[in-house]
């Protein structure tokens, strides 16, 4: 009899049993999982199907922190709350895998006090760009060579902002300067609106509309873009935060306006398998379960409709195109044979039943005569 039915605490699992999985028939709802977590405080619940002991958690934490021995800021720590509940906290690596553009917020929640006193040269200096480097990594903006800026614009540098272009943008085309087209990057990893030259009267109005986002001035030209695929970011989370809360934390970090409902977290394994994290999953603990090495598994932020890839399908992903074609042809042939086998089987069974019915009809006719 299973331990949740008897009320007795489960026997400790061996390391080879990690993570220990139980039937979904016994833990169907998150409420029941929470109740059991209070009933068995020595157990750590990953989701409604997976749990580990504190000893196993300690082993995972030790392995993880040894891997990042020289990077103390990446260590995952744990402690206990006042009521004795264990909590784990640390930095979680998340990779960008979205295919739709994201929208930055036009206003920060907290005011930027030194906005008026800061000069343009200070804001966009190389030192400043290094300090805010992670924000720039989101869409890989590099400083425009000042020799490309017309002298008339240099004189107005205190009134206007300096334009920045993606380092993956195509060379300037001979389009009209006021054309509000979207440039397409060479890697097709980002969308950046082509800079328009506004009238002098519009510049002050535009400056009023800009806000400070993570230390950056809001820029209409680069406020909508697609982050480069596989670009990495970090977000501080804890074991109380489930999948949707982690997504919210990431969007909040970069002041992204899109709804958390538009995204999902996926674990992509080295084998090519891609598994979506459920709402009840705790991403930080899932990271621990997969080990510290990103070569084995990585967590991606993806669009909500991104498809999962099973382990069966993943084994074919890295094969050569010609080999995949031959495999597909073989599967089609096998499918046809299987269909024919089933059709033949049921035709035989139907023939036997029809023969029995005919025999009964003959006997019934003879009896009535």
UniProtKB/Swiss-Prot annotation:
Domain of life of the native organism: Eukaryota
InterPro entries the record matches: RA_dom, RASSF1-6, SARAH_dom, SARAH_RASSF6, Ubiquitin-like_domsf
Domain Ras-associating: 218-306
Cited CDD domains: SARAH_RASSF6
UniProt KW Phosphoprotein keyword: yes
Modified residue annotations for Phosphoserine: 187
Pfam families per record: Nore1-SARAH, RA
Free-text tissue specificity from the UniProt record: Highest expression in thymus, kidney and placenta. Also detected in colon, small intestine and lung. Tends to be down-regulated in 30-60% of tumors derived from breast, colon, kidney liver, rectum, pancreas, stomach and the thyroid gland compared to the normal counterpart.
Example of a GO biological process term: signal transduction
Record domain SARAH: where: 313-360
Alphabetically ordered keywords of this record: Apoptosis, Phosphoprotein
Function recorded in the entry: Involved in the induction of apoptosis, through both caspase-dependent and caspase-independent pathways. May act as a Ras effector protein. May suppress the serum-induced basal levels of NF-kappa-B.
Subunit description: Interacts with MOAP1. Interaction with activated KRAS is still a matter of debate: interaction has been shown in the mouse, but not in human. Lack of interaction with MRAS, NRAS nor RRAS2 has also been reported.
PANTHER family (alphabetical): RAS ASSOCIATION DOMAIN-CONTAINING PROTEIN 6, RASSF
Protein name, as recorded: Ras association domain-containing protein 6
The organism of origin for this protein: Homo sapiens (Human)
Gene symbol of the encoding locus: RASSF6
């Amino acid at each position: 009899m299973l331990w949740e039915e008897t009320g007795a605490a489960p026997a400790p699992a061996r390391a080879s049993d990690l993570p220990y999985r139980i039937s979904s028939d016994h833990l169907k709802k998150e409420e029941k999982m929470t109740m059991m977590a209070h009933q068995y405080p020595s157990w750590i619940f990953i989701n409604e199907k997976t749990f580990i002991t504190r000893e196993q958690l300690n082993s995972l934490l030790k392995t993880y922190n040894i891997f990042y021995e020289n990077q103390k800021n990446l260590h995952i720590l744990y402690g206990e709350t006042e009521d004795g509940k264990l909590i784990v906290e640390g930095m979680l690596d998340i990779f960008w895998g979205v295919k739709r553009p994201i929208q930055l917020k036009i206003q920060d929640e907290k005011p930027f006090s030194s906005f008026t006193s800061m000069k343009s040269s200070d804001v966009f200096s190389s030192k400043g760009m290094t300090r805010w480097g992670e924000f720039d990594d989101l869409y890989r903006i590099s400083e425009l060579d000042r020799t490309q800026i017309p002298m008339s614009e240099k004189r107005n540098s205190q009134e206007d902002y300096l334009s920045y272009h993606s380092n993956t943008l195509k060379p300037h085309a001979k389009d009209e300067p006021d054309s509000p087209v979207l440039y397409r990057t060479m890697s097709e990893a980002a969308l950046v609106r082509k800079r328009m030259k506004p009238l002098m009267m519009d510049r002050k109005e535009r400056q009023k509309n800009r806000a400070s986002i993570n230390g950056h001035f809001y820029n209409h030209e680069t406020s909508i873009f697609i982050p480069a695929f596989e670009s990495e970011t970090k977000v501080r989370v804890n074991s109380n935060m489930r999948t949707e809360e982690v997504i919210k934390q990431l969007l909040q970090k970069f002041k992204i306006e899109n709804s958390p409902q538009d995204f999902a977290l996926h674990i992509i394994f080295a084998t090519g398998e891609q598994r979506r994290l459920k709402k009840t999953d705790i991403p930080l603990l899932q990271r621990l379960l997969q080990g510290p090495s990103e070569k084995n598994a990585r967590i991606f932020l993806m669009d909500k409709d991104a498809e999962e890839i099973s382990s069966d399908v993943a084994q074919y992903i890295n094969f050569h195109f010609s080999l995949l074609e031959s495999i597909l042809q073989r599967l089609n042939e096998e499918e046809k044979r299987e269909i024919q086998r089933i059709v033949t089987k049921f035709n035989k069974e139907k023939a036997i039943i029809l023969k029995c019915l005919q025999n009964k009809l003959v006997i019934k006719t003879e009896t009535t005569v």
